[in-house]
Design a protein with these regions (language model features):
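Short coil/turn segments at beta-strand junctions that form active-site/ligand-binding loops
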Residues: 1, 23, 42, 69-72, ...
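Short, well-formed alpha-helical segments that are part of the catalytic scaffolds
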Residues: 4-25, 29-39
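A short acidic (Asp/Glu
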Residues: 16-18, 37-38, 84-87, 128-133, ...
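Conserved catalytic core of nucleotide-sugar-dependent glycosyltransferases
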Residues: 83-166
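C-terminal catalytic/acceptor-binding lobe
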Residues: 1-4, 11-13, 159-161, 165-245
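A structural signal for short, well-ordered beta-strand segments and their strand-loop junctions
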Residues: 72-77, 116-121, 178-182, 222-225
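Active-site-proximal specificity loops/subdomain of glycosyltransferases
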Residues: 29-76, 81-95
Length: 245
């Protein structure tokens, strides 16, 4: 199966952490920043400046324009410190060749199960592995790591901070699920670095984005995590009204 591999990047021209670990991934950068990225040895795909602006817009541009005769597109954050799996109770970082094999085999699995989007766990906690259910089909898939088998679903550009929750729900609504590999997880520095979506992320905007997401899907599906010790938890809980795992 032919798969294209991309990492959108904005205002982070230093050598990409992701590309150091996984050199098969190409950074997708806007034209006005391209020279700075090239100076630091990044392998890039140049897109028009208008393709950037928020994380949903650039991902949609990739999905609309960069399949390059592939059956699927892999999109990962540009600051990924590694993709890990649990083997014999130990957390192991995948090398470049192992990740390529992992992506291809699970993309085939996803397609065979009738889904068009798959990803991995968003937390490293061993408790999230769930040995007896290593696969999920009704679970949230974070946008830092996702594979998209060609389809017509796109990210909501009005939800640039909650785009992955909405995107997951769109796939579940249309295809009755999407595949999550629970025994693997990604490690990224979300909201900790300059550039990316941190340029427009703040508490006020997070609350506004939550309200928009809840208005779109309803309060029975989108709820606040009341168990959180934070004054306001950025991450909503999604409750899927379907039976399954």
């Amino acid at each position: 199966m032919k798969i294209s591999y991309y990492a959108p990047s904005l205002k982070r021209p230093q050598k990409s952490i992701t590309q150091k670990l996984y050199p098969f991934v190409k950074l997708v950068v806007k034209e006005s920043e391209a020279n700075e990225y090239l100076k630091n040895g990044n392998e890039i795909i140049i897109v028009p400046d208008m393709a950037q602006g928020n994380v949903s817009r650039i991902r949609n541009y990739i999905l609309d324009n960069l399949y390059d005769n592939s059956e699927a597109i892999f999109i990962i954050d540009d600051d990924c410190n590694g993709v890990y799996v649990y083997q014999k109770q130990k957390r192991i970082k995948l090398n470049s060749d192992e990740l390529l094999e992992f992506i291809e085999s699970n993309t085939i699995l996803c397609k065979e199960w009738g889904y068009y989007h798959w990803g991995i766990n968003c937390v490293p906690d061993k408790g999230a592995y769930r040995e007896h259910t290593p696969f999920g089909t009704l679970q949230y898939i974070g946008s830092p790591f996702g594979v998209h088998i060609k389809n017509d679903i796109r990210y909501d550009e009005e939800l640039p901070l909650k785009e992955d929750y909405d995107y997951t729900l769109q796939h579940i609504k249309k295809y009755n699920g999407c595949l999550r590999i629970n025994y693997a997880n990604y490690e990224v520095k979300q909201s900790e670095q300059v550039g990316g979506c941190s340029t427009y992320r703040n508490l006020k905007e997070e609350k506004l984005q939550f309200e928009k997401l809840q208005n779109k899907w309803g309060s029975k599906i989108i709820t606040i995590d009341k168990s959180s010790k934070k004054t306001y938890d950025f991450n909503p809980i999604i409750k899927i009204p379907l039976k399954g795992i």
